[in-house]
């Protein structure tokens, strides 16, 4: 885990026989640090897969830099804003209204809730986790009971809810995530 400061996403690096995956890429302004942490963590291996739990700029701002550094990198995002990424709409992605910077990036597939994805050498479940972001997903590895919750759940609660960004009252959705 690459632990970051307050209001910046941590990054999770998972490696196994099938390759290496990174969960979330951090702010674009932290891209140099993210690349240095990855280089040390990968120990000469390639980064094969990048997953975004949601598309706030502290979780996907480094995507473009990682895609440039690792040309064969496959990127998967939650399905909710895939059309806005495909057509790169920074207003709909809330970057412009919030004054956030997120360089355009591409994606190769979506992280569909209700499916599994192999990270390291184990299958992880993809679950919808609306609340902090209505399109957020969490990743759960049932054998070890390891959860990557991003901003859906925090150590002593849940992430900040922004009803003004999406026009949604997400408090009931947070309760549903807690019930998972």
Which positions does each model-derived feature cover?
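Metallo-beta-lactamase
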Residues: 20, 27-29, 123-180
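Conserved beta-strand hairpin/beta-sheet module of binuclear metal-dependent hydrolase folds
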Residues: 1-43, 138-150
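Active-site HxH/HxHxD metal-binding segment of metal-dependent hydrolases
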Residues: 27-32, 36-119
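Divalent metal-coordination and catalytic microenvironments
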Residues: 14, 24, 54, 66, ...
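Short Gly/Pro-enriched turn/cap motifs at secondary-structure boundaries
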Residues: 2-4, 106-108, 128-130
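Short, flexible active-site-adjacent loop segments at beta-strand->alpha-helix junctions, enriched
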Residues: 18, 79-82, 88-91, 115, ...
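Residue-level detector of beta-strand structural context in well-folded domains
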Residues: 10-12, 109, 114-115, 137
């Amino acid at each position: 885990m690459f632990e970051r400061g307050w209001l910046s996403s941590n990054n999770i690096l998972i490696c196994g026989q099938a390759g290496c995956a990174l969960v979330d890429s951090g702010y674009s302004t932290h891209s140099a640090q993210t690349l240095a942490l990855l280089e040390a963590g990968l120990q000469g291996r390639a980064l094969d897969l990048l997953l975004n739990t949601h598309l706030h700029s502290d979780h996907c701002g480094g995507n473009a830099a990682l895609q440039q550094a690792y040309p064969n990198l496959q990127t998967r995002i939650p399905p909710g804003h895939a059309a806005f990424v495909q057509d790169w709409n920074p207003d709909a992605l809330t970057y412009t209204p919030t004054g956030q910077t997120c360089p355009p990036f591409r994606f190769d597939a979506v992280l569909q809730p209700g499916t599994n994805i192999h990270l390291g050498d184990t299958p992880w479940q993809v679950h919808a986790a609306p609340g902090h972001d209505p399109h957020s997903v969490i990743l759960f590895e049932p054998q070890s009971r390891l959860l990557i919750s991003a901003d859906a759940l925090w150590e002593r609660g849940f992430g900040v809810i922004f009803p003004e960004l999406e026009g949604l009252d997400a408090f009931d959705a947070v309760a549903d995530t807690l019930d998972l």
